[in-house]
């Protein structure tokens, strides 16, 4: 344990609890504004690139070819529901037996206790809310009305999208607003055919490419973070050595 005895060195303008998606961004904002910031994380340290032990492994290089054993599934009935909880990424997840919790109602709590938290494991889909969503409580007569409007949060969406790097197509849909996008991922030939047929048969139904936090054409702001183009490996949950997707480890921290 490193204990600082100098009062000046252990005095901070801001303390952030947790180093995941929200904590990493909060720390970035404080530091960008010149505030000396301390980030506290309950889990182990995971350094970008250095601590992604399976990122370049092939299935045959893993004992169970990337799959879980029956014992692991039985011992982790909750976390094993997550698509990314497999042999190649299980070290980034909290195991059920090690951190049990009380469920008054069914709730699958998927957790990751390490630097970066679940920003290493998220599915990276980043659709904006629209005014339709913000109007939901008033329109449908439930819950508490939102104290903000889409118009107010729109520039903040753009601020985050520009820094994080969100790819997507500008589809002009009121229900799914466009943003500050990098070029979109390309649809497969099957998806393009499906899109064409849906447009022919159902003019009011739109098939679009998802807006996701993957760098298709990195801008200077992403290159300055040390990040590169997404290679489409579909192994993101292992940690990306290229920084192709947004995480606290590859970006904000």
Predicted regions and their residues:
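A short, basic/flexible loop-to-alpha-helix module at the beginning of a structural domain
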Residues: 1-11
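N-terminal Rossmann-like FAD-binding beta1-loop-alpha1 element of flavoenzymes
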Residues: 13-39
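Short, glycine-/Ser/Thr-/acidic-enriched flexible segments
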Residues: 22, 44-45, 120, 126-127
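Glycine-rich FAD pyrophosphate-binding loop
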Residues: 31-53
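Acidic, Ser/Thr-rich peripheral helices and adjacent loops at domain boundaries
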Residues: 52-68
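Conserved redox-cofactor binding core of oxidoreductases
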Residues: 63-70, 75-93, 98-108, 113-114, ...
């Amino acid at each position: 344990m490193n204990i600082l005895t100098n009062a000046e060195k252990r005095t901070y303008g801001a303390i952030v609890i947790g180093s995941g998606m929200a904590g990493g961004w909060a720390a970035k904002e404080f530091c960008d504004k010149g505030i000396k910031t301390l980030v506290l994380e309950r889990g182990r340290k995971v350094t970008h690139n250095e601590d992604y032990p399976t990122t370049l492994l092939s299935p045959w290089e893993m004992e169970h070819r990337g799959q879980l054993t029956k014992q692991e599934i039985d011992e982790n009935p909750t976390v094993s529901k997550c698509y990314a909880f497999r042999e190649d990424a299980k070290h980034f997840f909290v195991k059920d037996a090690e951190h049990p919790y009380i469920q008054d109602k069914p709730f699958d709590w998927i957790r990751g206790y390490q630097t970066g938290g679940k920003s290493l494991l998220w599915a990276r889909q980043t659709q904006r809310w629209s005014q339709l969503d913000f109007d939901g409580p008033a329109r449908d007569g439930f819950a508490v009305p939102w104290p903000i409007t889409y118009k107010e949060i729109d520039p903040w969406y753009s601020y985050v999208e520009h820094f994080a790097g969100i790819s997507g197509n500008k589809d002009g849909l009121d229900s799914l607003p466009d943003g500050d996008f990098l070029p979109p991922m390309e649809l497969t030939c099957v998806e393009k055919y499906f899109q064409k047929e849906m447009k022919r048969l159902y003019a009011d139904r739109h098939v679009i490419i998802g807006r996701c936090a993957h760098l298709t054409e990195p801008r200077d702001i992403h290159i300055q973070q040390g990040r590169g183009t997404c290679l489409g490996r579909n192994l993101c949950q292992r940690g990306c050595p290229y920084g192709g997707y947004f995480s606290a480890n590859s970006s904000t921290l």
